[in-house]
Amino acid sequence: MLSGSFADLSAPLALILQDWIHGPTGDALARIILRWSHFVAGIVWIGILYFFNLINVPLMKKLDGPTKKIVIPELMPRALWYFRWGAVVTVLVGLTYYAMYIMSSNAHNVGANVWAWLGQWLLVVLVFYAILYLVLQSVNNGNLLAVIVALLVIAFAGVVLYLLGEKGDNKTLSIGVGGGLGIWMLLNVWGIIWRAQKKIIAATVEGTTPPADLARKAFLASRTNAWLSLPMLFLMGTSHGDYQIFGTNK
């Protein structure tokens, strides 16, 4: 009797669920996996970035030497592992999605060569990062650095819009600028922050004082990434939201 009741309900229930729930297939499955991976890795990366800047830096200033010797070797290697690999996954997956599904679609619609677009964009990203890297190696004043970084971001956005703006749509341009800032942040993580933090952790374990300029460079690079994350996240939002900041939505 009971089994018969379940059988009577199963058919209409299946029809209802079929109307309400639709599993991704084919190309849609690849897209959603890439986007989901990008979101999860980005949350890990940026979440730890904000933890470092808003919580860890003020806390470390209050700890004495013996306490740092206990806390830093336990906390920092693990946090930095998730931090740096979260950055790698975020950027690589984001680049894959951008090239395959956003820039390629836009380029096809306007009759442009997607590889030429991608190559020009990456070249601009790397040239501007080289300038940022030199600035981070030479500028020790946080306020001056903030001004320079702001000007660099504006100049970078202007060049990207000049190269892609005539035919680029809002998604291509928003992620072109925002994703470029994300690549800068990734390069800062591996090229400056992680390299410096390895030496700082080793010195702390050995009971020696790490060079002050090393800690300062790591701090300023991390703070720069925190600044860059704000326009980066804003532009990620405008690329898929209701606000069209650049180009067209064709």
Predicted regions and their residues:
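Polytopic transmembrane helical bundles with strong interfacial aromatic enrichment
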Residues: 2-250
